[in-house]
Amino acid sequence: MTKPTLTYFPVRGRVQFPRCLLEYLGEEYNFNEVKTISDDLRKQLLFKQLPLYQEGDFKIVQTPAIIDYISEKHDFRGKTKEERARAHQCLAGIMEVLDHCLGYSFKMDKQQQEKFRNESPIKKFFEGFEMVLSQNKYLASGEKETYVDLMAFVMVDYVTNLGLMPSGDYPKLISLKKHYESSPQLKKYLESRPQSNF
Amino acid sequence: MSTSSVPSLTYFQGRGLGQFSRVLLSYLGIPYENITVTEISDALRATLPYGQLPIYRDGDFVLTQSSTIARYIAKKHNFMGKNLEEEFLVDQIVTAIHADIFPAFNNPVPEKLQKLYEKYFGSFEKKLQETGFLVGSSVTLADLYVYVGFDYIRFRGEAALSSELSDEKYPKIAELKKFFESNEGVAKYIKERPETKF
């Protein structure tokens, strides 16, 4: 079977979500790091955007679609239609958080960061995830973890790294972060990933 | 709250993000209760995972995030493509419309919107010219999403730079619009929906 390839810039950004997923699932993949989108590469991109996931002739863009595809391959999306839908509902929320942070995180000074944390547009998502985890062991509300628990870890880790963690207490999310941080599958990637501020 | 045995979709009276699932349910001929609200009351807010509408209820099963709702309904009714690969090719288009096109209305910058439309609708038009469908060899949620997105921008008028999306420039997407609007369920929905600003 062909080893999949992920193409992205040398930063964490959006690609850290599918990368963490592949690492955690133990699937070997190539990471094609690019500084710019060349004309040749642009021709392969449906919406002229990265990340791009390739597996043989199959190509897909859009981070959530890539995450879903990898998870489906590894039976990591949840057992039932309902569970899969709940997982996707959380993933959509995680992507909204990412969009809020990616847009302007690296343009903020300390004062603006503080303001963002206190009046955070992402706070409602953190509260929502925390509420689900206080009532269920996993975010998709099933009996087993799914990709979305791991994606929530990546979100918390990323937001913390950017200094944009919303004010408030999120013990369940912090515990989730600790759980995945200590995962042997992720150790190597977490230590070697780019030290970028976005 | 709805006690009906048919599913319900709760959203503001406007089209907005509720439109995708309303049109989808109408197209598939699925009876549903269309609940409209003028604001999010405290009682309603308490039932919303992220404090946002739309919300979809099917018995005890509750779902938010418009793209998740639409995908759930489409998957349940075999409208996500014929196989796994097609499902995720549909997903990448749905995600693009939700995550990239819709947020651009919040702070419209004419030059940016123009480029955005050319990039996305240009790629959809090209695909429709080449194969007749956005994914695979039959109509899917991707086609419906492009129709609803295209139609919604035109409905929003010049604030959304609607003149950029002419039938002449995008003849295949215009055909897609005709196709969906000739569907009995969609035609009935369009005829009955109220005139709103958004």
UniProtKB/Swiss-Prot annotation, chain A:
Q: Which InterPro entries match?
A: Glutathione-S-Trfase_C-like, Glutathione-S-Trfase_C_sf, Glutathione_S-Trfase, Glutathione_S-Trfase_N, GST_C, GST_superfamily, Thioredoxin-like_sf
Q: Please report the stretch or stretches of sequence annotated as the GST C-terminal domain.
A: 80-198
Q: Which residues form the GST N-terminal domain?
A: 2-78
Tell me a Gene Ontology molecular-function term this record carries: glutathione transferase activity
Keyword annotations for this protein, in alphabetical order, are: Transferase
Q: What is its EC number?
A: 2.5.1.18
Recorded catalytic activity of this chain's protein:
RX + glutathione = an S-substituted glutathione + a halide anion + H(+)
Question: What biological-process terms (Gene Ontology) are attached?
Answer: glutathione metabolic process
Instruction: Kindly list the positions annotated as binding glutathione.
Output: Y8, R42, Q49, L50, Q62, T63
Family under the similarity heading: Belongs to the GST superfamily. Alpha family.
Q: Which PANTHER family match?
A: GLUTATHIONE S-TRANSFERASE
- Summarize the protein's role: Conjugation of reduced glutathione to a wide number of exogenous and endogenous hydrophobic electrophiles.
- Name by which UniProt lists this protein: Putative glutathione S-transferase alpha-5
Taxonomic classification: Eukaryota, Amoebozoa, Evosea, Eumycetozoa, Dictyostelia
Q: Which gene encodes it?
A: gsta5
Curated annotation (Swiss-Prot), chain B:
Listed under catalytic activity are: RX + glutathione = an S-substituted glutathione + a halide anion + H(+)
Gene3D superfamilies xrefs:
1.20.1050.130
A Pfam family: GST_N
What's the top EC group for this one?
transferase
Q: Which biological process terms from the Gene Ontology are attached to this UniProt entry?
A: glutathione metabolic process; response to curcumin; slug development involved in sorocarp development
Q: Which residues carry this modification: N-acetylserine?
A: S2
Which residue ranges does the record assign to the GST N-terminal domain?
Answer: 5-81
What GO molecular function annotations does the UniProt record carry, in alphabetical order?
glutathione transferase activity
InterPro entries attached to this UniProt entry: Glutathione-S-Trfase_C-like (IPR010987), Glutathione-S-Trfase_C_sf (IPR036282), Glutathione_S-Trfase (IPR040079), Glutathione_S-Trfase_N (IPR004045), GST_C (IPR004046), GST_superfamily (IPR050213), Thioredoxin-like_sf (IPR036249)
Its domain of life reads: Eukaryota
The protein's UniProt keywords, in alphabetical order, are: Acetylation, Transferase
Please list the residues that bind glutathione. Answer: Y11, R45, Q52, L53, Q65, S66
**GO cellular component: a single term:** phagocytic vesicle
Tell me which residues make up the GST C-terminal domain. Answer: 83-198
Q: What is its EC number?
A: 2.5.1.18
UniProt KW Cell membrane keyword: no
Family listed: Belongs to the GST superfamily. Alpha family.
Protein role? Conjugation of reduced glutathione to a wide number of exogenous and endogenous hydrophobic electrophiles.
User: What is the protein's name according to its record?
Assistant: Putative glutathione S-transferase alpha-2
Q: To which species is this protein native? A: Dictyostelium discoideum
| Recorded name of the encoding gene | gsta2-1
